[in-house]
């Protein structure tokens, strides 16, 4: 009989030949603007720790205190033994920050997306999704069983055409979009999407993963940034990027959150977020709101790097309005080579390749804790390489 697992090795060979093979790179020591990678200190431009809070002593102290009081794990699902007072405090803090009626905390942003989407739509419904949406949105759409159609990236006109042609054929319609697109750094046209959602009686779900703590006057996200606070939509985000912890959330109306508590499988059938992660996220939200200087420093760094990168000839910098800056390369092999050269020069900014993105690139993530010397070294190395 043939080996039913033989195809695995063949598939790995195909991945290698296409220069798509991936492996982990072990980071040593505490999270920060500089980390130790393979025994060598490098400047970290690969992290989503935008405000530099993952290594903040106050988050660490909050996590330690919660662990000492409650133990290491939540021990059960939130509907059984896994709900702590801390969870409720965190959900109230998120709802207050986002200016929504309520919020619900999940064990990760990925689980928040797939759980919410699966709960909101089904076989009689339509999902319209931006083609560059995060994998969690795309997989949630597939798992829901709804009819899924993609529209070209940020093309509101095409989305409207699809709504005109298809909306009347379905019970419900859910529009899905990232607010900050994680592999490009650009923003969705949120006000126009909200207008279409209202015009065609659609739900709109916006993933604020890379906007939470970063965008808007108080860091509440792109909904705040675009002046759309108070408009009817579903906001999802993560606690693991600018907030330096772990977990995800959904924020919205009381009926929405109450419904998800009863119908979102990835919330109902999994262990609640650990006390340590919950306490750290709560501390991070307080810091993000009370200490805007971290966000101001982040944006100063973003603007400084963009200004310097624009002076490098032949660098194909992609449009961005966030702390994510990418420059495009011709092939996966070139991206791998540039990533290797950067690493040899003490810069950690790995290659991003298909199928994660349509075209290969180097992705640079800025942090509030980057110093001018870090940014200047990155630019000098890129100028030499290009």
Swiss-Prot record:
Gene3D superfamilies named among the record's database cross-references: Aspartate Aminotransferase, domain 1, Type I PLP-dependent aspartate aminotransferase-like (Major domain)
Cofactor(s) needed by this chain: pyridoxal 5'-phosphate
E.C. no: 2.3.1.47
Residues modified to N6-(pyridoxal phosphate)lysine: 241
Pathway: Cofactor biosynthesis; biotin biosynthesis
Record-listed pyridoxal 5'-phosphate binding positions: 109-110, 182, 207-210, 238-241
Residues that, per the record, bind substrate: 22, 134, 356
Keyword Transferase: yes
Annotated keywords: Biotin biosynthesis, Pyridoxal phosphate, Transferase
Residues that span the membrane, as ranges: none
Pfam families: Aminotran_1_2
GO process terms (BP): biotin biosynthetic process
Reactions listed under catalytic activity: 6-carboxyhexanoyl-[ACP] + L-alanine + H(+) = (8S)-8-amino-7-oxononanoate + holo-[ACP] + CO2
MF GO annotations: 8-amino-7-oxononanoate synthase activity; pyridoxal phosphate binding
CDD domains: KBL_like (cd06454)
Functional note: Catalyzes the decarboxylative condensation of pimeloyl-[acyl-carrier protein] and L-alanine to produce 8-amino-7-oxononanoate (AON), [acyl-carrier protein], and carbon dioxide.
Assigned protein family: Belongs to the class-II pyridoxal-phosphate-dependent aminotransferase family. BioF subfamily.
NCBIfam families tied to this protein: bioF
Record text on subunit structure and interactions: Homodimer.
Descriptive protein name: Putative 8-amino-7-oxononanoate synthase
Organism: Trichormus variabilis (strain ATCC 29413 / PCC 7937) (Anabaena variabilis)
């Amino acid at each position: 009989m043939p080996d039913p697992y033989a195809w695995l090795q063949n598939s790995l060979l195909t991945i290698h030949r296409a220069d798509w093979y991936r492996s982990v790179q072990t980071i040593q020591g505490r999270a920060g603007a500089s980390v130790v990678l393979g025994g060598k200190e490098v400047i970290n431009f690969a992290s989503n720790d935008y405000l530099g809070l993952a290594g903040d002593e106050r988050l660490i102290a909050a996590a330690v205190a919660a662990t000492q009081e409650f133990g290491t794990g939540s021990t059960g699902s939130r509907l059984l033994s896994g709900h702590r007072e801390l969870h409720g405090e965190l959900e109230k803090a998120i709802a207050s920050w986002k200016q929504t009626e309520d919020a619900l905390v999940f064990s990760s942003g990925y689980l928040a997306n797939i759980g919410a989407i699966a709960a909101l739509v089904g076989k009689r419904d339509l999902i319209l999704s931006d083609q560059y949406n995060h994998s969690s949105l795309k997989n949630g759409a597939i798992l829901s069983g709804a009819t899924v159609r993609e529209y070209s990236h940020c093309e509101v006109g095409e989305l409207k055409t699809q709504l005109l042609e298809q909306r009347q054929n379905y019970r419900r319609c859910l529009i899905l979009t990232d607010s900050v697109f994680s592999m490009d750094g650009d923003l969705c046209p949120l006000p126009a999407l909200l207008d279409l959602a209202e015009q065609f009686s659609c739900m709109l779900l916006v993933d604020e993963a890379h906007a939470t703590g970063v965008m808007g006057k108080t860091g509440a996200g792109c909904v705040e940034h675009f002046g759309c606070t108070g408009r009817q939509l579903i906001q999802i985000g993560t606690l693991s990027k600018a907030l330096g912890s772990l977990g995800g959330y959904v924020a919205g109306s009381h009926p929405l959150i109450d419904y998800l508590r009863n119908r979102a499988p990835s919330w109902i059938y999994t262990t609640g977020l650990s006390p340590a992660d919950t306490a750290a996220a709560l501390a991070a939200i307080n810091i993000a709101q009370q200490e805007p200087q971290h966000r101001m420093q982040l944006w100063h760094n973003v603007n400084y790097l963009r200004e310097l990168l624009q002076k490098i000839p032949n660098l194909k910098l992609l449009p961005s309005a966030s702390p994510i800056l990418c420059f495009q390369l011709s092939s996966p092999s070139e991206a791998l080579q540039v990533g290797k050269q950067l690493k040899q020069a003490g810069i950690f900014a790995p290659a991003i390749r298909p199928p994660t993105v349509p075209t290969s690139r180097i992705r640079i993530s800025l942090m509030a804790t980057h110093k001018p010397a870090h940014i200047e070294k990155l630019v000098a190395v890129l100028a030499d390489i290009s």
